[in-house]
Amino acid sequence: MSIKPLHDRIVVKPIEADEVSPGGIVIPDSAKEKSTKGEVIAVGTGKPLDNGNVRTPSIKVGDKVIYGQYAGSTYKAEGVEYKVLREDDILAIIG
């Protein structure tokens, strides 16, 4: 899939939650929470500033990130679901 986000947008592929709890209980799809972690697969050029400059994103392709549960828009391509987020929607980079 080829997608190029614009400006300060970032495309993230959500990392699915475990299907089995630490205690060995299988978690059905209906009980799973939406993922709030993902891997960055594309990054825009940056946020345009009022003075004409562009703020370079601090997020890079390949970073693992945490984002808000209701942040961004969902995009589905080739059977895979992606999130398109603004850089400000990213809460943390997982190291």
Curated annotation (Swiss-Prot):
The keyword Chaperone applies. GO terms for biological process: chaperone cofactor-dependent protein refolding. It is found in: Cytoplasm. Keywords: Chaperone, Cytoplasm. GO terms for cellular component: cytoplasm. One of its GO terms (molecular function) is ATP binding. It holds the Pfam family Cpn10. The keyword Chaperone applies. It comes from the Bacteria. SUPFAM superfamilies: GroES-like (SSF50129). Heptamer of 7 subunits arranged in a ring. Interacts with the chaperonin GroEL. Together with the chaperonin GroEL, plays an essential role in assisting protein folding. The GroEL-GroES system forms a nano-cage that allows encapsulation of the non-native substrate proteins and provides a physical environment optimized to promote and accelerate protein folding. GroES binds to the apical surface of the GroEL ring, thereby capping the opening of the GroEL channel. Belongs to the GroES chaperonin family. This is Co-chaperonin GroES. It comes from Xylella fastidiosa (strain M12). The lineage of its organism: Bacteria, Pseudomonadati, Pseudomonadota, Gammaproteobacteria, Lysobacterales.
